[in-house]
């Protein structure tokens, strides 16, 4: 094997690796099997007849970027002295081989977990990669491609950042306008601003006159200690009254200044919003109208608010999608042109005993020292990898350091006992916990149940509940959420996703009433008529 292992110079790159873990093997496998499929992405980018021409053009442009048949990126593959060309987006041929010819666009994710899955990944991806990019000449060619795509990526990144900042400024501008002013805005803002400015000027003239009189009163006071004693108290009373009047005028002027500022911000905000009101620039602002819909008891209006994406535009999304593709291509050229990446991959396969004819075996100390960096290389090649918690013990067993990987995504977290996620969380830098506490509870063995009964200390009382899960812990520390249920039975749920896109009636309505206190918003596509007819049988099959 290669005599050295290599780490990535810029450690921040490792922030973007993603490990998806769950108790449910099928759930996490489905995620990583679906992401590389071209059909799902292409379908989501299909324009409809109702779309404006500008929106259709934007969708069609991004659609073609993810269509392998329209890709202008061609790879020359040389094996056994013979060369052939293949169209590519992001290691497309490896993804196709890994997923059994599933018509993929790129190797964005892979299912691990079971040992058979890891071996299949090695045989379908790592071995061909090592063979295809063995030549120094090939790597040099890809270095030139790397520099070329880097320019495109940086240019696109600058464009996306400028759009983000512009949208952020509008968001901040909306926040600077008082809510009551948004709700009761004058019809003619320019006229209203002029009126308020005239009032301010009038008060400023009055203030100037009062200040002048005060100065004259102060200067007309008798000089000397004995002379001042003889002065009547009426003058002092008059001076105090002048000061009170001046203070009141200052307050009124400040109030008018604030109103002018608010009206000017509202005027600028409305000007910006009118710019973002059609085509690819159309945007949903979080304003008084949006909030009225959001909290409305009318299910149709509240659902409309829930399914919107505030402060985003179609143009911004399309440019972000192009940026994502350029980022994938940048990754690809970097990975191919790096000799260190190739060495790390070879060493990883030896550590995993992939080569049956390899007489060398990596020592435990070497494995534990090198494994964090070899896995980081794999995640650079395939950013999203899935595993079950049961298999994570084997997959990550040689990683003894914390924070080696980027983000841990726990799926079906309501089914996972808290201790199951500890090892994976230790090895990742942050975690996203996704689950539903109203669905299947964690499966607790008799031994675990017995241990929980021994937790007699008051501080440990919360850990005794059999239903406690990774999801419950995440919800407990999440300050954003809502309560489901009523009175003693209410349960805190963090960041609830209330829009439902899977079930149809009657299952949806029954579940929504029984488990979710009527908070869910249905957006499931209606089934085709021929399928709907077979959903409810004419008669019971139970009797």
Where are these regions (language model features)?
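Secondary-structure-rich domain cores
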Residues: 1-33, 222, 368-434
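Accessory, charged alpha-helical segments in nucleic-acid-processing enzymes
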Residues: 47-56, 295, 299-300, 304-305, ...
């Amino acid at each position: 094997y290669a005599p050295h292992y290599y780490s990535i110079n810029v450690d921040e790159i490792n922030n973007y690796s993603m490990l998806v873990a769950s108790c449910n093997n099928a759930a996490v496998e489905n995620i990583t099997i679906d992401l590389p499929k071209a059909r799902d992405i292409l379908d989501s980018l299909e324009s409809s007849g109702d779309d404006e021409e500008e929106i259709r053009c934007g969708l069609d442009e991004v659609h073609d970027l993810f269509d392998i048949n329209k890709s202008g990126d061609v790879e020359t593959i040389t094996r056994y002295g013979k060369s052939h060309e293949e169209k590519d987006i992001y290691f497309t041929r490896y993804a196709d081989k890994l997923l059994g010819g599933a018509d993929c666009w790129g190797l964005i994710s892979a299912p691990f977990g079971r040992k058979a899955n890891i071996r299949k990944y090695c045989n379908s991806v790592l071995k061909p990669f090592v063979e295809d990019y063995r030549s120094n000449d090939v790597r040099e060619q890809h270095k030139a491609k790397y520099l070329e795509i880097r320019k495109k990526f940086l240019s696109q990144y600058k464009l996306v950042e400028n759009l983000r900042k512009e949208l952020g400024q509008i968001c901040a501008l909306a926040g600077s306008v008082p809510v009551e002013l948004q709700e009761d805005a004058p019809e003619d803002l320019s006229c209203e601003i002029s009126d308020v400015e005239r009032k301010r000027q009038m008060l400023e003239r009055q203030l100037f006159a009062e200040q002048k009189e005060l100065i004259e009163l102060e200067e007309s006071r008798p000089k000397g200690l004995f002379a001042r004693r003889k002065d009547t108290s009426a003058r002092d009373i008059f001076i105090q009254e002048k000061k009170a009047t001046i203070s009141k005028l200052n307050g009124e002027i400040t109030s008018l200044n604030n109103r002018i500022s608010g009206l000017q911000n509202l005027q600028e905000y409305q000007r910006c919003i009118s710019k973002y009101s059609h085509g690819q620039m159309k945007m949903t602002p979080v304003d008084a109208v949006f909030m009225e819909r959001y909290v409305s008891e009318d299910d149709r209006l509240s659902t409309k608010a829930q399914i919107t994406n505030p402060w985003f535009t179609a143009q911004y999304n399309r440019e972000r999608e192009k940026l994502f593709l350029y980022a994938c291509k940048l990754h690809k050229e970097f990975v191919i042109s790096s000799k260190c990446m190739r060495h790390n991959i070879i060493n990883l396969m030896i550590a995993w005993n992939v080569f049956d004819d390899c007489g060398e075996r990596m020592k435990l100390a070497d494995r534990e020292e090198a494994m964090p960096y070899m896995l980081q290389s794999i995640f650079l090649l395939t950013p999203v990898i899935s595993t079950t918690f049961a298999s994570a013990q084997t997959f990550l067993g040689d990683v003894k350091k914390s924070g080696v990987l980027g983000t841990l995504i726990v799926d079906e977290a309501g089914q996972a006992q808290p201790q199951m996620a500890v090892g994976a969380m230790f090895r990742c830098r942050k975690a996203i916990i996704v689950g539903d506490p109203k669905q299947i509870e964690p499966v607790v063995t008799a031994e675990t149940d017995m241990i929980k009964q021994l937790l007699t200390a008051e501080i440990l009382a919360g850990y005794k509940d059999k239903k406690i899960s990774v999801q419950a812990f995440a919800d407990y520390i999440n300050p954003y959420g809502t309560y489901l249920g009523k009175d003693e039975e209410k349960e805190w749920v963090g960041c609830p996703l209330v829009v439902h896109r899977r079930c149809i009636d009657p299952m949806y309505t029954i579940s929504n009433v029984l488990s979710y206190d009527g908070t869910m918003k249905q957006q499931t596509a209606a089934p085709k008529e021929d399928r709907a007819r077979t959903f409810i049988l004419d008669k019971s099959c139970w009797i």
